[in-house]
Amino acid sequence: MTLSFFDQFMSPTYLGIPLIAVALTLPWILFPTPSARWLNNRLITLQGWFINRFTQQLLLPLNLGGHKWAALLTSLMLFLITLNMLGLLPYTFTPTTQLSLNMGLAVPLWLATVIIGMRNQPTAALGHLLPEGTPVPLIPVLIIIETISLFIRPALGVRLTANLTAGHQLIATAAFVLLPMMPTVAILTSIVLFLLTLLEIAVAMIQAYVFVLLLSLYLQENV
C-alpha cells in the first residue's frame, strides 16, 4: 500500500476508538499535581514559574473583568504547548494538526467573548463595527467590512493547523530525501533536518502562545 505524506495527519483508530481522544487526555496525565509544600521538585517549580510569568503577561492588558478567564486561558496555553511538543516525537500523532480540533477550540471561545461584549456593553461592542469619524457615504461599506472581519476571527484555528502541518511536512520531506543519499551528503542534510526540528519546536511553542494571545485580545475588546 502506497502512503502519502499527509497520511501522518489522519486520526488513527484502535478497536473502533479514535486515538485522538486518548491523545487529548495525555497532557493532563503528564503534568505533575502541585502540592501545598514549600519545597517541591524542580519540575513543579519550573511549572509554577512558567504559569506565573505567563499569567502576568496575559492579564497585563486586561481589566478586572477579564481576570476571570485567567485559569481557562492558562490551561489552554499549557494544553496546546504539550500537544504540539508531543507531536514532534517519532511515531506520534499531533491532534492540533486537525482543523476540527482547533476550530472546536477557537469558535466557542471567540463566540463567548462576543456574547460577553453584547451582554455587558452592547453599545461599545456594536461601536467596533464602525470606526469613529467615518464619512457618511462609507458607513455601509465599513460596517460590512468590519462585520466580515469579526466573523473571520475564529480563523486563528486555521493558523495553528497550517503552521504545524507545514512544519511536519517540511521535516517529513527532508527525512525522505535524506534516506537515499550518499553518506557525505546525508551528513549535511542531517544538519538541516536538526535545524528544522529546532525551528519546529519554536513554532510549536509560539503558535500556542499566539492562539491564546489573540483570544485575550478579543476578550479585551469586550470586557
Swiss-Prot record:
NCBIfam families: ATP_synt_6_or_A (TIGR01131). Keywords: ATP synthesis, CF(0), Hydrogen ion transport, Ion transport, Membrane, Mitochondrion, Mitochondrion inner membrane, Transmembrane, Transmembrane helix, Transport. It is found in: Mitochondrion inner membrane. PANTHER family: ATP SYNTHASE SUBUNIT A (PTHR11410:SF0). GO terms for biological process: proton motive force-driven ATP synthesis; proton transmembrane transport. It comes from Oncorhynchus mykiss. It catalyses: H(+)(in) = H(+)(out). Subunit a, of the mitochondrial membrane ATP synthase complex (F(1)F(0) ATP synthase or Complex V) that produces ATP from ADP in the presence of a proton gradient across the membrane which is generated by electron transport complexes of the respiratory chain. ATP synthase complex consist of a soluble F(1) head domain - the catalytic core - and a membrane F(1) domain - the membrane proton channel. These two domains are linked by a central stalk rotating inside the F(1) region and a stationary peripheral stalk. It is a multi-pass membrane protein. The chain crosses the membrane at residues 12-32, 69-89, 98-118, 132-152, 165-185, 197-219. One of its GO terms (molecular function) is proton-transporting ATP synthase activity, rotational mechanism. Component of the ATP synthase complex composed at least of ATP5F1A/subunit alpha, ATP5F1B/subunit beta, ATP5MC1/subunit c (homooctomer), MT-ATP6/subunit a, MT-ATP8/subunit 8, ATP5ME/subunit e, ATP5MF/subunit f, ATP5MG/subunit g, ATP5MK/subunit k, ATP5MJ/subunit j, ATP5F1C/subunit gamma, ATP5F1D/subunit delta, ATP5F1E/subunit epsilon, ATP5PF/subunit F6, ATP5PB/subunit b, ATP5PD/subunit d, ATP5PO/subunit OSCP. This is ATP synthase F(0) complex subunit a. Belongs to the ATPase A chain family. SUPFAM superfamilies: F1F0 ATP synthase subunit A. GO terms for cellular component: mitochondrial inner membrane; proton-transporting ATP synthase complex.
